[in-house]
């Protein structure tokens, strides 16, 4: 808002000065000052009254007022929040005092709180509660947000102050964590166009603006296909499916006003059990194609053209900074350091993974032939026949295991682990005390179980629904800081479990249980943070998966098995012989899991190290996989047209390798626990 008003008054001043220089100059300066004051009054009024901007109040250090949130307030909130932040930035940049850590770096850490609150609501509307109305607002606002960001990163006076602090003698007097904040702040500007001038700076900003539009469209196109493509089946097509899966599919159909039918929604949690258990091969193929063709249906929501433009713009942008390719720029400040080091790790594992897939396919084909099924193993057969082999070889039925994996019990198991490792205690908060964005969401207070001190809040949004993006993820509304008084974290976990019929328990697969623990690891990272400054929360991308992958190891520890793996009907604990069968099958199907992941990670890196001029993403994906020797019997975990990790934003672009990089760290850490006297619950190692 403020930027638009200033631009208008500047043009008016120029017009006046052309006719009456002296008088116009005086009047225009007065007009500009009055207009600026008026605009800031409007901004301050919005911050005080707009539900998306107001300070969070209530218990637990203040919480987001989701019960008062309305899309009607979003545009005004974003505009006012950006204007307020730019006013703060201008004050920092034009401070007449010499630049110091306190008046420049800490001042920047402190700035922008109202807009940060708005983006907490934005994140929920984007990922958990999307709608056509929000997507239209998102389309309109994303370019403005990009322009606002460029206005900050290309503020020459601001960057000069940051650089002065970075190069000053004061750096030697700062604590290590303060030095790290300065380093990250400087890099955040220098690596994002602050050193550019003239046409190069203008082009850099224009590229970022266009990328913001493309990233938004990519994500919304995938979400559209997840909502629009639902496979409905009838009672005579349920062969092979368990009662719990059938019940979940019936509930999903009922929610869509298709009573008497069964809905396989276009999400992994819904697709996976169908491909694993359904005897209907034609339907397995239909469900498989529906899922893996998200964003690739040749219609207005097709993402291939967007991918090409995204890659071209990213490459051009880093070229302005002097880099050979996007991956070189991206990995420069990551643990891997260079694309070559990341590629070396992945390519070292790839041949063994593919060889294992070939063995798995041979076993499946032999089983199919023995059964007289008269088929050649195809991608929609992989899960189905591997499940048959698992049952034959290990006497292990995934459906049998699911009877011991109730969502509520697994949640309690995670709380137990967090208590043993971090001394955290999770206490459910009565519904209605803390506002939530959907009735499915529940909140727990996290305290130190020894001292009783408040740590933060944990929100859980467990179920799939229309408007919620697929997959599982962790996020936060507030991170821990102490530089300006202690702030307590507000952390969230989000899943897409299929909601059962009312009164029915939520049973989940072993893979989903593993993912549940994985994402809780991210939440624990947020809750256990102990840093002074906001910039220090998180970590480099190829490290951030370490803590989440490590927590997966606690899913199958004895205390969790003995106390939380209980049968849904009998309440009996999982028998030892079933535990032994699960242990025996621990590495079963690893060819599939490793190869589908690595294919995505390798294609990501090849995309971002290749000249993207005239690139055809569909052909590039196909030719790259062929060159790698990708088995025909399985796809990438994320095909390019729905690879949101790398194309709906830049968080994981040229960075999907990070899961494998972190797995190396995870193996070392897990070994340290395993060798400790107290095992995975050893206090000293924890």
Enumerate the predicted regions with their spans.
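N-terminal helix-rich structural modules
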Residues: 25-243, 248, 679
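Active-site-proximal, well-structured secondary-structure segments within enzyme catalytic domains
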Residues: 177, 181, 213, 220, ...
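Short pre-active-site segment immediately N-terminal to the catalytic Zn-binding motif
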Residues: 406, 497-517
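Short His/Asp/Glu-rich catalytic/ion-coordination signatures at enzyme active sites or charged loops
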Residues: 58-73, 122-141, 164-206, 265-305, ...
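A broad, structural surface signal
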Residues: 72, 76-94, 106, 110-113, ...
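Gram-negative bacterial Sec-dependent N-terminal signal peptides
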Residues: 1-27
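C-terminal, non-catalytic "cap/extension" segments appended to globular domains
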Residues: 36-73, 80, 240, 261-263, ...
